[in-house]
Amino acid sequence: MRQKIDCFLTCDCIDNLKEEIARLRNSRTIQNIVLLTADASDNGDDYPEGCTLMEVDSPRSAETIRKIAATATAEYILFLTKATTLTIGQTALERLLRVASDSNAAMVYSDHYSVEGGKLVNHPAIDYQKGSVRDDFDFGSLIMIKTPLVQKYARENQDSQLAFAGLYDLRLFLSREGEIFHLNEFLYTEEEQDLRASGQKQFDYVNPANRKVQVEMEQCVTRHLERIGALIDTSDYKTPDFNEQDFDTEATVVIPVRNRERTIRDAIESALSQRAGFDYNVIVVDNHSTDHTGDIVEEIRQKDQRLIHIIPERNDLGIGGCWNLAINDARCGRFAVQLDSDDLYSGDDTLQRIVDAFKRDKAAMIIGSYRMCDFDLNTLPPGLIDHHEWTDENGPNNALRINGLGAPRAFFTPLLRQIQFPNTSYGEDYALGLIFSRRYRIGRIFDELYLCRRWGGNSDAALSIEKINANNLYKDRLRTLEISARQQMLKGKEDIMADTPLLRFFNRQVETWDDARRRYRDLQKVETRELQYEDHTLTLQYNPARITSTGASIDRKAIAERPCFLCEANRPQEQFKKIIDDRFELLVNPYPILPTHFTIPSKRHEPQRIKGNFDEMMRLLTDYPDLMVK
């Protein structure tokens, strides 16, 4: 394993690396050592023996990658990607080299130790996945890459002007060319320079000061998604039918909560104080609070019947599970709108503006903008989080790169019921945003609608590296799933769930009507037999459950004496209706002979004859092709 590695070390102070450079010079695995510096003239001839200096603009630019590619001659490149004090572990280089060779990986990275405030702590990394396309993936500062692949990237990107995203673009390229391999061994020690809490770091990507960086990153991830066959074309989006189901309430504010006695009253009162030109309610799902949260909710409910207090029967629900409980409740409105139990709406028009945006944008999901503030509503950096990087054309693609989509989030309830939240307490909203954006538009409101209060009780205020890794691993898993789903969709594979308004209407009816659900289930017991008649095949069905309707007397006297079961006043309370035009309604037939069986009655009490209505029926088949029996 002699002289297999060329080292490229980012350096802003040579003294920080002198000891490590001396050890590298004595390693039999090292061929060349190159120090990357912003201004080689500053160091003059005062740099360690056996090294060369390379002047670069930034270790992350495409120009730097090209210079490294032109200089490297060894089989592998060891790249220190940031200026930091570094100590490579005993035999770590030999281990990296062996793993790189055995795995045949395009790139290898490892766990490391971190010096934080003078204290040595473990800093494990996580495995790289197909969905690890976010630009802030934590590889640590030391990576090993196959030299021929870096050179191939340089040849294919000779004209790239990426000033900030060159290293990110290289990584995406490497993931297409081979495996990015995580060696979960602690192989080196670096000094951590960013000691901010996780709750502060997580908003770096929306800081306006980083706008140029983010533009480049978006360009790179867009090209990557196109090359792997996962780029969404938003011109192919579906348009939601907001009238596909009847709702008693237009909108519902959903507040999942557990042990927030200090903030829940403010959140509920913020929701109930909304001024809107429609009926709305508030569903609080109290996930078995052990403090006074439940008492506070119940006290408010006694005074305002718009507040619905739900306590789950289950004890295994996360935030996503609490959301599912709320949206599947019959009292949930047409649009379900988020409000966290820590937070507030900025004004009394938030709900109205969100519902207006649904109808204006013909979107299935709406996301607003929020301001970071402390408990007393004083603004905290970076202030307004408006996700102005989002565009209608490319937002759904760039969403795979960033860590969040914004707040408040609102959903068209029938679609939300079809998809359902994952039962987690982290990333559940992000998962829904990705899935919605695969086929439907996400509308944005770039004005402030929401106050995100940061305080010591926030669940994400200051997380351990283990918790950060668990969160990042999960979101990367969501991205992996979404990229796979988009690749399959773009190849023509149909979704596991039929995504049409009529089938959602049908499924909701069967879910909420026990007798009808039983009869549809019993269709599996129906016996059929085929008969040939000339050139036609006839199918006979033996369906005992159908005898109730088919065996009923239909003589004139019996019909006159029997209430018309098609008239709305005589229908079962459980039966939904869908108005399809000014003459006809659509009902789910509770005595089916087909797996999906609709009835189309006239709104007027009159003989239900197809004669004279053929043109109308053909128009309905054009508007609702799901009605066709094939």
Where are the model-predicted features located?
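Conserved donor NDP-sugar-binding/catalytic core segment of glycosyltransferases
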Residues: 90-122, 349-382
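A conserved acidic beta->alpha catalytic loop
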Residues: 37-45, 85, 286-296, 315
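Short, acidic, metal-binding catalytic loop of nucleotide-sugar glycosyltransferases
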Residues: 20-31, 269-279
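Glycine-rich, basic loop-to-helix element that forms the pyrophosphate-binding segment
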Residues: 57-71, 313-331
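Short, flexible, basic/aromatic active-site loop/helix in glycosyltransferases
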Residues: 117-141, 369, 382-402
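Active-site microenvironments that recognize anionic phosphate/pyrophosphate groups
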Residues: 495-607, 612, 627
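A conserved hydrophobic helix/loop-capping motif in glycosyltransferases and polysaccharide synthases
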Residues: 4-16, 27, 36, 251-263, ...
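Acidic donor-binding loop at a coil-to-helix junction in glycosyltransferase catalytic cores
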Residues: 160-170, 425-432
